[in-house]
């Protein structure tokens, strides 16, 4: 380990005893590193039930931490300073708060944020979205493997996406990380336990950590690593990638997240095992992008493998950015598709909320820009959309083109209440953008004016629910509303409000349904009666005059409302048409520019290839001509000097002049032959006919030469 660098993987991976129980099972979501294929490899689920529990022994080899230790108060902080609340409602059953559970559609849970007691206004304390804080770990044990030390197994079945364990350790900055790499290497530590938390920050579990440090590597793992925001800090957890059976070893892919020493031999024995893991240069083992980023971009494992195979065929090295574990070249090559489902939007937003890399952010934003489904745009807003875009405006503060795209996208978002805009402070951020980029003032000012027209409402709080009657507010939390609808307070009572449609209802809108969180509740969706009905008031009979007057006023009001609604609808349709036309033009420009660049790159590549081919062909031709000319020169050089000997003795021409004449004659004769046919080779021997022709040419040449020589002597 003399050459220490930011290289993936550290400790040897899982070995598998041959005498253990084996189950064949196909894992549909397994990430593999074999040849590109949509079909996952067959994974043999080996169970280690008979292996002795070594948990206590393993705990004696390091300092077991309750929580991560931070080298200073700044490390581990997420980028957003404001806590993001969910919109779930407290749901106590049998003394336990079931709010924000796995199937609750909790916006914090969907975007990898844990709820915090007393900070989330409505979901209540100790909700189901506090797995890191409550240390709700899976039932696991440490055992001894045959090939490389400790491993971790499941002591009971673990369902897909279940939280297994938090990866704890000392959270340090990059300078300290590099120092420790060298220090551990000098101390001859066999295994390092580093994980990148975020750019420039690492978790070191080498000396202080948790049982998660013993999870080994596999080329076809059953677990994955994800980063969650917990009370303003980024924390790293290991989650089940598929259902894990009792007795199975828990593994994840070191090449995605782990940092440490040089490449090491891999013992996972998976069908797709590439034989080693780690090292700075990524090869077959490389996951080119972190799993959450790849999923958010819609990139399949087969696409990564195909790209790796292509690069290997071209003899190119495949390297990741040391700082962020991302292959930028692969990222740039990805074809971006729009978000088509709410799940697509959720994956994109969860990454954007933690994003630091501008290139990744641009690619993810393109997925949103290309999406035109209004229901999905409502989903963007719901998943802390305004908070997310406030951060993105800060991230791209110096890049005017990207800011312009973001502002136009914000203009496309459907109307909602003003509450999200106020809480995220996005209006102040847009004003800051306009101040620093005057060319964006028009769209920015338009956006601010649009938001000013939005209505602000008091949202239902936990206190409102506690003070309400059982037939009303306590059951409101059971209702799952269609996209664009919210429950707000107006004049002390709840209303169903749709800002886009400018509609308020006393009753749940069409499409409303019960939420998942309250399966045991049998209360119907509430319908709010007027005060007189609640008090069982008696309705007085109207006189004929009163009845006609009310009827006339009602008809006038209805006609006026219909006329106003038609005018508003016409204006809304015109504005929407103009907005869609403008957005369509922007998208067409983006696509055209991308196609132009792609075509330009293709033409440049074709030009380079043609130049290389022409140069090679020209060089080849010149080489062939040069060789042929050399052969003819040798051919004539074997004859001409002998013919010239008599001129040297008879005519008394000096030796230097005679040598020069021989060179000139040979050169002329060779050139003549090349001119006739450059591909024709000279004969092996000089024929009589050829020798005769050479003599004739030599005599003619020498006569002219002697004539010139005589004239020269006469002048002198």
From Swiss-Prot:
Its EC number is 2.1.1.359. One of its GO terms (molecular function) is methyltransferase activity. The keyword Coiled coil applies. The keyword Methyltransferase applies. Residues 597-620 have a biased composition (Basic and acidic residues). Residues 1-42, 515-545, 597-623 are annotated as: Disordered. GO terms for biological process: ascospore formation; cellular response to xenobiotic stimulus; DNA-templated transcription elongation; DNA-templated transcription termination; methylation; negative regulation of antisense RNA transcription; negative regulation of reciprocal meiotic recombination; regulation of DNA-templated DNA replication initiation. Residues 539-628 form a coiled coil. GO terms for cellular component: chromosome; cytosol; nucleus. Keywords: Chromosome, Coiled coil, Methyltransferase, Nucleus, Repressor, S-adenosyl-L-methionine, Transcription, Transcription regulation, Transferase. Residues 515-524 have a biased composition (Polar residues). It is an enzyme of class 2 (transferase). It holds the Pfam family SRI. It catalyses: L-lysyl(36)-[histone H3] + 3 S-adenosyl-L-methionine = N(6),N(6),N(6)-trimethyl-L-lysyl(36)-[histone H3] + 3 S-adenosyl-L-homocysteine + 3 H(+). Residues 262-278 form the Post-SET domain. Residues 81-136 form the AWS domain. Histone methyltransferase that trimethylates histone H3 'Lys-36' forming H3K36me3. Involved in transcription elongation as well as in transcription repression. The AWS and SET domains are necessary for transcription repression. PANTHER family: SET DOMAIN PROTEINS. Belongs to the class V-like SAM-binding methyltransferase superfamily. Histone-lysine methyltransferase family. SET2 subfamily. This is Histone-lysine N-methyltransferase, H3 lysine-36 specific. It comes from Candida glabrata (strain ATCC 2001 / BCRC 20586 / JCM 3761 / NBRC 0622 / NRRL Y-65 / CBS 138).
